[in-house]
């Protein structure tokens, strides 16, 4: 059983997966800055769920090292006794920022287990930034969640790994967000990648993420070419099983 709730309209979530309750990529206060304000600063259009209103949770999961996923000011406000599970680059950042907190690395080769839920990090074949990870989260019955907030291109080994599991839910961006190549090129690859992933891993349900039309200023917002999805049209695609969550209500998936 999966219970899921948006914590903002971008890419922060509360998820209950069987007996594990976790908060994913929380950015719940203030703006997010990528390096410098002159480069990129963004704000939510709709206020996120207040921190005190988050349902009870066991852990915090961080998928990327970038501020809109690994938001330090939000993490400072969350209880210190909550363990933080993080992919490689986020782990390194968080260990420096919070030396006294329990921070656990989600590896690419050996699964990390928490309350009988396993996590594996899926990394693209890149050594230069931007590097965007995906997460495979699964239970003892091989039911899984595939989370790729910036989309993902699976190689053959990664596709073989993911296909060992029954993916109940795929959470990925539907937005196409492109910068000049020197600044990273495609940040979010858009619907073509959504369809590619859908055909590769056959999820039962699909939910979009990281698609908020945020207020932004700086060089990135001047140079970015953005194509937001038409969610109503996507809802009408036959046999696609897309669930449009545009509010802060919880839904349960069986």
For the regions a protein language model found, what residue spans apply to each?
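Extreme N-terminal starter segment of soluble prokaryotic enzymes
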Residues: 1-4
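Cap/insert and terminal regions of metallo-dependent hydrolase folds
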Residues: 89, 155-250
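Active-site HxH/HxHxD metal-binding segment of metal-dependent hydrolases
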Residues: 46-112
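Pre-active-site segment of Zn-dependent metallo-hydrolases
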Residues: 20-61, 73-74, 153-165
